[in-house]
Curated annotation (Swiss-Prot):
This is Anhydro-N-acetylmuramic acid kinase. One of its GO terms (biological process) is peptidoglycan turnover. The keyword Magnesium does not apply. Pfam families: AnmK. It comes from Streptomyces coelicolor (strain ATCC BAA-471 / A3(2) / M145). ATP binds at residues 9-16.
């Protein structure tokens, strides 16, 4: 089946699309990536998203505008993906949507909201769409995150030692696959979220992120600010756990700076990069990780990657590209995989990773132009991901 995955992460800067041919062969799920593309959100829509994220408040009218605008932006990218990546023919679109709110109380997730009306995608492409992938896991008592864990576990199944997959988006999440143990997956804390917020704040919105980590590389880590940031109780909570920009946002950073003032913006950025490195490393050390497979936007930040390497001496650090999963496309491919599992009657969440009571079939299906025809339910779930070929 030819599947398109659509994703926009907590950095909410663009819609990412990746396409792949997916097939079940015995214990293997065989993936042949077909390519990926990215399109920035229209400026007005991106600004509306930014203005609506916590701790800001949004009206129901704004939520409706966002649901339509994000759905239309995803639909535009899906049409391009069908044409440019799939030669005009695909069988399924899987849309993560845009997370606007992840509702956590006392460590338990009560709800999660991803916007981007899938009907726009189905109407534009004529294809069935799997969407709203997180809600079912939350209803089963899980965190609804990190859902990339299924792809991580399958991709690392044959690796020796104790491999872990690290995704550095707005939030950092890690999946640990230790021999003889259930897989573990959780959010370690902020990755780009606080750094991006700091850059926008210090530049008055002229820049959205620290390109190549240049400003962090020019700064010095401030021990006082780092101590204040590391005092957050989130880091001491046991996994499974998840977080988001509901917690790690600009007012959070400004409160930390009020407690531990830092004069130079570059020093703030260096400290935030070190915060990510320390919290990632603490999580990896706690589980004896020997190899770290990195993906996401933060993987392109050499200063951040260097700090993680400094914090984890002796750990083999590399890109998910080595496993056949391009770092920039991995999340979109992961959601393509989850939607493929759904239409084949297979669960997409890992209870030991999300904390759910059971492994659930994920998502809701919006039919395309033709009557909905699903494959016969598969028997056993795959145990390994085999990536072949490529674009």
């Amino acid at each position: 089946m030819r599947v398109i995955g659509l994703m926009s992460g907590t950095s909410y800067d663009a819609v990412e699309a990746a396409a792949a041919d997916l097939e079940l062969e015995g214990e293997a799920l065989v993936m042949r990536p077909l390519g990926h593309l990215s399109a920035p959100y229209p400026d007005g829509l991106r600004d509306l998203i930014a203005d609506s994220l916590p701790p800001a408040a949004a009206t129901v009218r704004t939520v409706a505008r966002l649901d339509t605008g994000i759905g239309q932006a995803f639909a535009d990218v899906a049409v391009r993906a069908v044409r440019e990546l799939c030669g005009g023919a695909a069988g399924l679109v899987v849309s993560h949507g845009q997370t606007l709110y992840h509702w956590v109380e006392d460590g338990a997730v009560r709800g999660t909201l991803q916007l981007g009306q899938p009907a726009w995608i189905a109407e534009a492409t004529g294809l069935p769409v799997v969407s709203d992938l997180r809600g079912r896991d939350v209803a089963a008592g899980g965190q609804g995150a990190p859902l990339v864990a299924m792809t991580d576990v399958l991709a690392m199944a044959a690796l020796p030692g104790v491999p872990a997959a690290l995704n550095l988006g707005g939030i950092a999440n890690v999946t640990v696959v230790a021999p003889g143990a259930e897989p573990l997956a959780f959010d370690t804390g902020p990755a780009n979220a606080l750094m991006d917020a700091a850059v926008r704040h210090f530049t008055g919105g002229a820049a959205a992120f620290d390109e190549d980590g240049r400003r962090a590389g020019a700064g010095r880590v401030d021990p006082g600010l780092l101590r204040v940031l590391l005092d957050d109780p989130y880091y001491g909570r046991p996994a499974p756990k998840s977080t988001g920009k509901e917690q790690f946002h600009l007012p959070y950073l400004l409160a930390a700076l009020a407690a531990a003032p830092v004069a130079e913006p570059d020093d703030v950025l260096a400290t935030l990069a070190r915060l990510t490195a320390v919290t990632v490393a603490d999580a990896c050390r706690a589980h004896g990780v020997t190899r770290l497979v990195v993906s996401g936007g933060g993987a392109r930040n050499p200063v951040l990657m260097g700090m993680i390497a400094e914090e984890l001496p002796g750990v083999d650090l590399g890109s998910s590209d080595a496993l056949g999963l391009p770092s920039d496309a991995k999340e979109a491919l992961a959601f393509a995989l989850l939607g493929f599992l759904t239409v084949n009657g297979l669960p997409g969440a890992i209870p030991s990773g999300t904390g759910a009571r059971r492994a659930s079939l994920l998502g809701s299906i919006t039919p395309g132009r033709e009557p909905l025809r699903l494959p016969e339910p598969a028997g056993e779930p795959p145990r390994v991901l085999r990536v072949v070929g490529g674009p």
